[in-house]
Amino acid sequence: MKGPIAAMMAAMAAIKRSGTVLKGDLYFTGVADEEEQGKGTAYMIKNGPHADGVIVGEPTDMRLSPGNKGLEWIEVSFKGKKVHGGRQKEGINAIQMASRFVSKVYDEYVPLLDSREYPVLGAPTINIGTISGGDQPSTVPDHCKIVLDRRMVPSETIEQVYEELRELGEELHREDPRFQCQVRDVFDGLNLLPHLPFLTDENDPIMTTVKDIYNDRGKEIVIEPFPAWTDAGFISSQTQSKCLVLGPGKLKVAHSVDEYIDIDQMEEAAEIYAETALRYCGRK
């Protein structure tokens, strides 16, 4: 986001220096905690400012991203019975139970998610990101935990996501009464805003304004969903603002040792941000 922030500030400075007076209000909000719990954006949503149109600066390579999937981090814990490895038939291996759950996710649940293809955003996804459990190799483990990443489309609800995962566990319990698992939100109790999906209509003024600018510049218009979570999900679900994710830089080099951004693209972004403000807000 560093490149988009610089381009946005340059755009605002250019408008100020030009002496142009806008009919509407133009805000820059540099929010903190975007990578963790979104506290900066939550503060802005509660206290303002609120805008009709919002551009969220992320490295889209200057492609227009009118939406992203929702996000839930979910912990599934498995309970077993600890015994010495030499008497493992008397125990219940929690890691083995976890592996059965993971297999069921990929064998049965993923195909279901693939069938829920949504316009622009594509199909919802699930990723088993971490697994931990057990104490030592010679002991049957009585505990195991996986943490998964679940990406949602607008046709799904958060409640539905948890119900479906719990149903997978209940099916395994019916097959084997020894199977026990609990499903919970990783951030349960923190009172965070829900990470809902968002999708802005392609005919919304924030979209048509930028598309018109691209056409006038002879720049190819590429519209695609942003593959990662953005604060646009918070803003669009909690306010009346219409959001567009747009910025210089490539996501594939973000968070990397060799992270970089092309200066030419930053300059282009600053020009497009400024022109968007002029056209969207209008001039007095």
For each feature predicted by the language model, list its residue ranges.
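Generic detector of well-ordered alpha-helical packing
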Residues: 1, 34-35, 59, 85, ...
